[in-house]
Regions:
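N-terminal binding-site loop/beta-alpha segment at the start of enzyme catalytic domains
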Residues: 1-68, 185, 279
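Alpha-helical scaffolding within the catalytic cores
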Residues: 1-4, 52-59, 88-90, 138-141, ...
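Acidic (Asp/Glu)-rich catalytic clusters
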Residues: 7, 55-65, 89-96, 121-123, ...
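Short, acidic/polar
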Residues: 22-34, 80-95, 141, 163-164
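Acidic-and-aromatic substrate-binding clefts and catalytic sites of carbohydrate-active enzymes
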Residues: 22-25, 43-53, 77-82, 108-113, ...
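A structural motif
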Residues: 39, 97-100, 128, 152
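Glycine/small-residue-rich loop that forms an oxyanion/phosphate-binding "nest" at active or ligand-binding sites
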Residues: 77-116, 120-121
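Beta/alpha (TIM)-barrel catalytic core signal, keyed to glycine-rich beta->alpha loops juxtaposed to Asp/Glu
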Residues: 107-279
Length: 279
């Protein structure tokens, strides 16, 4: 495994396993399969409703807690100092741990400044090894990092070959925040898995288009957390460290960037209205 060093000196695996949209009843099996493959970084969230199943899997694995890099996220219905603080304790209870390796604010809506204050307190108390944000565009990230006492260590945002987040990466790097990808496969949109550029480059190394897309992100200094419920694909997604894309390969894949979300925009008033409706 390869690692990145966060702005507080904590080492984070470059490759992890995500459980977004994995039903709670399947999560334990999937996480145990991922651990068997070799994953040690596991990414969940309050809004995934499978934290308890992740905790069950980690406990059943028999491996010591310190073997894992465990991430979860505070959902917007728990925004604000008091609610966030209580929800973080509840997440730890579900995950069967007394500390988290990384805790993120899931969305830049609601009283996320209150949430971040609660996170800073728990960080100072040693309950959180690193804290950060998710889905924060460059403007929102710059705002919170300017006012935060503990600077965000990670920003997990939509990042894939069709949305390479070049502007966000520029500012995150400038201020020492690690970019992490959600949706590294774009959920297969724009026919990613049969894309001719990715397919042709992958064939040179005996790799799939999916593996090529992940390798591109790794070589672009992006942490990735691909999700699959199939163990054979978990293994494929893990086998990324035995080949290196050439500068020419990287340039060809960089040309795929459309610079726009394939899902939704946090700047769209309709998106904001939806988030406000659940607060």
């Amino acid at each position: 495994m390869e690692y990145v060093t966060l702005n507080n000196g904590i080492r984070m695996p470059k490759l992890g396993y995500g459980v977004y949209q994995t039903p709670a009843e399947d999560t334990k099996r999937c996480v145990l399969d991922a651990i068997d493959v070799g994953y040690r970084s596991i990414d969940t969230a309050q809004a995934y409703y499978n934290e308890a199943s992740v905790g069950d899997a980690l406990a059943e694995s028999g491996l010591p807690r310190e073997e894992f890099f465990l991430t979860t996220k505070v959902w917007i219905t728990n925004a604000g100092y008091k609610k966030a603080r209580a929800s973080i304790e509840e997440s730890m209870r579900k995950l069967r741990t007394d500390y988290l390796d990384l805790l993120l604010i899931h969305q830049p809506f609601g009283d996320y400044y209150g949430t971040y204050r609660a996170m800073e307190e728990l960080y100072k108390a040693g309950r959180l090894r690193a804290i950060g944000v998710s889905n924060f565009g460059p403007d929102r990230y710059l705002d919170i990092q300017h006012f935060a006492e503990i600077k965000p260590a990670v920003n997990q945002i939509e990042t894939h070959v069709f949305q390479q987040q070049k502007t966000a990466k520029e500012y995150l790097k400038k201020y020492g925040c690690q970019i992490e990808s959600w949706g590294p496969f774009a959920e297969g949109r724009k026919d990613m898995f049969t894309n001719p550029v990715l397919t042709q480059i992958g064939e040179k190394y005996g790799k799939t288009a999916a593996q090529t897309a992940l390798r591109f992100l790794l070589q672009s200094d992006v942490v990735v957390i691909p999700k699959s419920t199939h163990k054979d694909r978990m293994q494929q997604n893990f086998d990324l460290f035995d080949f290196t894309l050439t500068p020419e390969d990287m340039e060809a894949i960089e040309a795929l960037d459309g610079g726009e979300s394939l899902f939704f925009s946090h700047y769209d008033p309709k998106t904001v209205e939806w988030f406000m409706s659940i607060l």
